[in-house]
Amino acid sequence: MEPGKGRAQPTRQVLLFFVFLGGSLVYSETWSYSIAEEMEVGTFIANVVKDMGLDVEDLVARGARVIFDDYKPYLRLDPQNGDLLLNEQLDREALCDLTEPCILHFQVLFENPLQFFRAELLVKDINDHTPTFLNNHILLKISEGATLGTLFQIDSAQDLDVGKNGVQNYTISPNPHFHLKLRDGDEGRKYPELVLDQSLDREKESQLSLTLTAVDGGSPPRSGTTLINVVVLDINDNAPEFEKPVYEVHVPESSPLDSLIIKASATDLDAGINGELSYSFSHVSRDVRKTFEIHPISGEVYLKAPLDFEIIQSYIINIQAIDGGSLSGKSSILVRVVDVNDNPPEIAMTSLTSPIPENSSPEMVVAVFSIRDQDAGDNGRMVGSIQDNLPFVLKPTFKNFYALVTEHPLDREVRNEYNITITVTDLGTPRLKTQHNITVLVSDVNDNAPAFTQTSYTLFVRENNSPALHIGSVSATDRDSGTNAQVTYSLLPPQDPHLPLASLVSINTDNGHLFALRSLDYEALQAFEFHVGATDRGSPALSSEALVRVLVLDANDNSPFVLYPLQNGSAPCTELVPRAAEPGYLVTKVVAVDGDSGQNAWLSYQLLKATEPGLFGVWAHNGEVRTARLLSERDVAKHRLVVLVKDNGEPPRSATATLQVLLVDGFSQPYLPLPEAAPSQAQADSLTVYLVVALASVSSLFLFSVFLFVAVRLCRRSRAASVGRCSVPEGPFPGHLLDVSGTGTLSQSYQYEVCLTGGSGANEFKFLKPVIPNLLSRDSDMEKAPPF
């Protein structure tokens, strides 16, 4: 590949022929080493650590390696001590043929940071080849009229060794007619020539046999021989002459086999057999004989083997024309091989780092590779590129070496794998290209916090639940991978310091399931909220939180509680109802509450038992007890009512209230409590005498008082008295009870207190002033219960 002038190229393309790096990547100094060919594998050459001033630890840590220009592993680097060792036996003749000196160029590559150390290895020749002649017999036809001192060229020997190990001398067997003269040729080679010392006489001796010996300069020297047969001919006084001393021809390397290269023509003024010419090669190299052939009669030169500009750019072909009298003429053909674009670029990966972390800094080296094209000129100039829209870029480093580096930030959650196609195209016609695919994986770092599926969760739990009940779940996901995406859940400290969160709920750290630790009571706690956290297992760990609201659903676990009349087992209060009461007369109102909520606290009332069915009725929605019909003198005075209070839960719960009702003709007559039990026999005996005497003495007066009282009451019948009742305890209800009916007291009624003085045996009736004035103009319609 030939260097060329640099020119600007589009983004991501790199012209290979103008790469010249400065800075610390490449050291300008070139280290030179040498070794003799055919040495054993493992032979020590040098210690690069000492030569280049490096540390042994850098060899492994920075991935040190040896790279030759032709990518063959001639040497290897021992990472333990930095010794440069022979990796395979070297054959100088196979590597460099006749080129001297035989130098192999290589680089010592270090990564992170990227550094190149240029070096070269001189392969020294040893004397391992013997000089050989192409022909075992050399035929010379010499006219007997040849003048003394005439030179006769003879074939030279070939020795694959070079320098002093090549052919250094020729000798010929002793004879009276010839001596040997050596002529220096191209590339320091020596060519033998016979010099005529004594005239030949065909009649005396028509043929001579001589032994030619070739000796090299090795130690010990090697030699080879051939036999020269000299045939003495009649006199031929004109030698052949070529048209040109040198012919020059340009041949494309893609020329087909057997194609005509050139026709060389010579003339001879002699006639007859002395004028008949034959053409042949003269002192040509092995490559020439392998590649070309000459027609002995016409002098046409044909292509015998393929040409390859990348191996040999030109050939010098020495030809001769010999007439029938053994006189010869000489000429040369310079064949210049014309390069064609027949070699695509080559890509050799040196290193590849995969996977790379997604938080890699810009300019991080991902891959290092080298490229080359064996063509010349524009055919060997190359441009490299990768696909667009990738966060990578190609950058030149050292001669024919390039680095694939990061250009933009990476995000594994957006893309975790890149399939990169490196394309190298030459500038020949037609253009040839080579592609190499690499896969770069992006490894995860913990850069994403867990995210809950919802910012807040609302959970519903029915009260009286069993402990360890699963009440719901929270879920969070993490866009990272591996342990960075493994989420654990936890309860965060509540904002309310009085909320005993640790005793209410727990959370499964692995799946986010929430459990109630104990039975919840709606009447004690209707709702509470707390925060849950989700934390990944990355380093450092990232977390997020979400709000959880727990609403306790009411269950029908509270029976109605009767506030009035009191059901505490003490002396019952008795409701007084005048016999003159109209139908719908308000006797009293049963007041009850339910600790539940919603429909579980909707209360309904019904008359469960009555002394006289049909006389009283209970309003189902507000608990008012009213007369169902007009009272008569035939109705008994004492009545016992049992009112059932029932909620609307499922299943419903209930309570009962017992009422004592006394029918009176008027509120001026004394009140006698309903006896619950007969007086003891002892008390009856002690009072019998006194009662009989008192009854007899006052009976007349008593009857008169009764008649007078009845007359007065009849006059006042138009002003019926309102109901009397015992006082309802005043003050707030207990905090855990809720009056949902909205009627906590008797409405539009009088309040009475009728009590019996305990232990006196005498009845005392107290008439109290009304608390709320009675509205006589009340509507005849029943009061509607408040809506639920």
Curated annotation (Swiss-Prot):
| Any GO MF annotation of the entry | calcium ion binding
Q: Where in the cell is it found?
A: Cell membrane
Indicate the secretion signal residues.
1-28
Question: What GO CC annotations are associated with the protein?
Answer: plasma membrane
Q: Where are the transmembrane segments?
A: 692-712
The protein here is known as: Protocadherin beta-18
Q: Does the keyword Glycoprotein apply?
A: yes
Which UniProt keywords are given for this protein, alphabetically ordered?
Calcium, Cell adhesion, Cell membrane, Glycoprotein, Membrane, Repeat, Signal, Transmembrane, Transmembrane helix
Q: Which gene encodes it?
A: PCDHB18
- Pfam family of the protein (one): Cadherin
Functional description taken from the UniProt entry: Potential calcium-dependent cell-adhesion protein.
- Report the SS bond pairs: none
Q: Where's the Cadherin domain?
A: 29-133, 134-242, 243-347, 348-452, 453-562, 569-672
Q: Which PROSITE patterns match?
A: CADHERIN_1 (PS00232), CADHERIN_2 (PS50268)
**Single GO biological process annotation from the record:** nervous system development
Q: Please give the residue ranges for the topological domain Extracellular.
A: 29-691
Q: How does this chain sit within the bilayer? A: Single-pass type I membrane protein
Entry-listed glycosylation sites: 169, 419, 437, 568
The chain's Cytoplasmic topological domains, given as residue ranges, are: 713-788
